[in-house]
Amino acid sequence: ASHGSPKSWAIGSLGRFGNEYSGWFDLQLKQRVYNENGKRVDAVVMMDGNVGQQYSTGWFGDNAGGENYMQFSDMYVTTKGFLPFAPEADFWVGKHGAPKIEIQMLDWKTQRTDAAAGVGLENWKVGPGKIDIALVREDVDDYDRSLQNKQQINTNTIDLRYKDIPLWDKATLMVSGRYVTANESASEKDNQDNNGYYDWKDTWMFGTSLTQKFDKGGFNEFSFLVANNSIASNFGRYAGASPFTTFNGRYYGDHTGGTAVRLTSQGEAYIGDHFIVANAIVYSFGNDIYSYET
């Protein structure tokens, strides 16, 4: 016991209820810029962060406690009705990424693509389903083997999903793919070859998910994902096991083309008028992947 505020333990591994004693928040600001003749433009800003629950003051910025944070995670413009071939789709430009899909009880993601800037199209009706596609870029810190020195590398990601494919009553399928490559300079490659920096390896992830909704509310989602290199390594983490390219923004590890598979089942069911039963099961296995934990 701390004889004070509650303390978190094993956030992102044992589950969020009862272990996440923090004040994380998302705040979205949205302003319509244009709306005429079936065409619409909105400016969107998303802020997220944490407000500490230990002290009455909660100033943001550098502080000894290090518990109060805030960032602009999204800042983009989204439009509808401007593309003749996809008038119903959302076309966006700016700091944004494809939609995240969360394993709710664990605060892990089955789909997550971090982005510093990019362009994308969402909810484009093609055939029986809809297409989401995004091309985004992000800089990552590539470390040397001492984990003391780093260099900044630009990466580019293409994220493609075909979703909302109807199967049977209240059941839909999604098929997804993602590929991440680096745009490295000659000096960055030289540091990897001669100065002990970890070699960048392109990484990919493919998968599918099936979502079944229930008559009385609730749903269950089953997903199958396979990945290689650094994304596969993140499948093996016991905390924060989302499909990241890096480990907390740091790129390191000997990635040698190994692959990993992850199976998930999650959902919730309404029992009567007053109770909700939730579930989350994740199973991962791989071969020749780098372990961030050991």
Residue ranges and their predicted role:
Residues 1-86, 124, 163-165:
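Beta-barrel outer-membrane channel/assembly domains of diderm bacteria
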Residues 30-43, 82-90, 124-132, 163-175, ...:
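Short loop/turn motifs that connect adjacent beta-strands in outer-membrane beta-barrel proteins
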Residues 9, 19-25, 68-73, 111-117, ...:
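Residues that define the transmembrane beta-barrel architecture of outer-membrane proteins
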Residues 108-211:
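Aromatic- and glycine-enriched pocket-lining scaffold segments that form the walls
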Residues 14-18, 56-68, 104-110, 144-151, ...:
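Outer-membrane beta-barrel domain signature
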Residues 25-31, 74-79, 119-123, 160-164, ...:
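Residues on the lipid-exposed face of transmembrane beta-strands in outer-membrane beta-barrel proteins
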Residues 168-182, 191-193, 197-294:
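Detector for outer-membrane/organellar transmembrane beta-barrel domains
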Residues 2-3, 33, 47-53, 95-99, ...:
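Transmembrane beta-strands of outer-membrane beta-barrel pores
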